[in-house]
A protein has these predicted regions:
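Hydrophobic alpha-helical membrane-embedded or membrane-associated segments
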Residues: 18, 50, 79-83, 87, ...
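Interfacial loop-to-helix transition and helix-capping segments at the boundaries
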Residues: 37-49, 120-135, 171-188, 221-245, ...
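Alpha-helical transmembrane segments and terminal signal-anchor/GPI-anchor hydrophobic tails
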Residues: 202-270, 276-289, 293-294, 303-310
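Aromatic-anchored segments of alpha-helical transmembrane domains
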Residues: 18-25, 160-173, 212-226, 271-277
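Membrane-interface junctions at the ends of membrane-embedded or membrane-associated helices
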Residues: 2-3, 63-71, 148-154, 196-209, ...
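Transmembrane alpha-helical insertion/packing segments
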Residues: 3-32, 143, 149, 172-182, ...
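Membrane-cytosol interface segments of multi-pass membrane proteins
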Residues: 1-163, 292-342
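Specific transmembrane alpha-helix
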Residues: 49-62, 134-147, 169-203, 236-255, ...
Length: 342
């Protein structure tokens, strides 16, 4: 059956969101005394959205037999765009009325508030993880074209290799925000689609070539952790083959996790939406406890950066996010997907 539930991909989603939470936790700690540790953790966790896009492409193709563009967009409007808009409200108020968001364009705060809000929503810059939504929306809009490739011209999947090399050269960030990110992540999304399309062959191929794929992964990790010159962009070198390896590894060994990651995987989109709020909340609390002052957007890394504090911080954020979503689901029932994305 084409849309048979893929437990290993479900577990992969739980692994991916855990790494994403870890990636956004790193900057909340002060790594002055442990820079190499920070670089290694950063290489492991940062840009794990690559895994999310691979999974999204895989599931898009896997479920494509029942694809209807209108109902597809309606569902994405309800479960992705609506919670994005609702959950953006606190951050939009904070970063247009009270605190200037770091990393914005020099001219940004000279613009009227309505334009600031529009630019925040178009780019996702108001909360670190939320660039994902404007970017994935571009994939939703071109879904019929992607499906046409899969159904009528699957030989075009060979373009994944040169597009991957282009992404390695260009990197994720550029002047066009979500468009740059979409270009960067496009080969990974297509890789997920291709893996699903040629599932049996792909599983055999990856199992046979696991060693060279692992070597490429480790080279990419070394390049990022040791700060080799850029370009190339090493996290794309690392995580595209790593996505293939994890897919096949979890296919064989997802039973090790049993159902421990099932709920985290099930609410992963909701975690993506809200976890940055808890990172910030803990940061505000720790600045007040340690420095005795109110956090105003700068100097929030008052906790020493090491493996123990990193794991504790990330796990706390993950648990707070999961608990919040669980409560929201209990209180709002089926409406929770529109409110918190899960």
């Amino acid at each position: 059956m084409q849309d048979k539930f893929q437990q290993h991909i479900h577990v992969f989603r739980g692994v991916a969101i855990t790494l994403i939470v870890g990636a956004h936790t790193i900057s909340a700690l002060n790594w002055t005394d442990n820079p190499l540790t920070m670089r290694i953790i950063d290489a492991l966790c940062n840009e794990s959205s690559i895994f999310f896009f691979f999974i999204a492409g895989y599931l898009f193709q896997h479920l494509s037999a029942r694809f209807r563009y209108k109902s597809y967009l309606t569902q994405k409007l309800k479960t992705v765009i609506t919670p994005y808009l609702l959950l953006s409200i606190p951050a939009l108020i904070i970063f247009t009325q009270f605190v200037h968001r770091e990393g914005m364009w020099p001219w940004f705060y000279n613009e009227p508030v309505w334009k600031q809000v529009a630019l925040f929503l178009l780019t996702g810059k108001h909360l670190a993880p939320l660039w994902f939504v404007p970017t994935i929306t571009l994939f939703y809009l071109v879904a019929p074209l992607l499906l046409a490739v899969d159904r009528k011209r699957p030989q075009l999947y060979w373009l994944i290799a040169p597009l991957w090399l282009l992404s390695i050269y260009l990197g994720r960030d550029g002047p066009y925000g979500p468009i740059d990110k979409a270009v960067y992540l496009f080969p990974v999304y297509m890789l997920g689609m291709a893996f699903s399309h040629y599932k049996q062959q792909a599983e055999v191929w990856v199992a046979r070539l696991w060693l060279p794929l692992l070597i490429v992964t480790l080279v990419g990790m070394a390049g990022d952790a040791l700060a080799w010159p850029v370009p190339p962009h090493y996290l794309m070198i690392m995580k595209a083959p790593m996505a293939l390896l994890l897919t096949v590894a979890l296919l064989r060994w997802h039973g090790v996790f049993r159902h421990r990651l099932d709920y985290i995987a099930h609410v992963s989109f909701g975690i993506f939406f809200i976890h940055a709020y808890f990172i910030s909340a803990i940061k505000v609390g720790m600045v007040y406890l340690v420095a005795g002052q109110v956090y105003a957007g700068k100097g929030g890394d008052v906790i020493p950066g090491n493996v123990l504090f990193f794991v504790a911080y990330a796990v706390t954020v993950l648990l707070m996010s999961v608990l919040t979503i669980w409560v929201a689901q209990k209180l709002t029932g089926n409406n929770s997907r529109m409110l918190v994305g899960a």
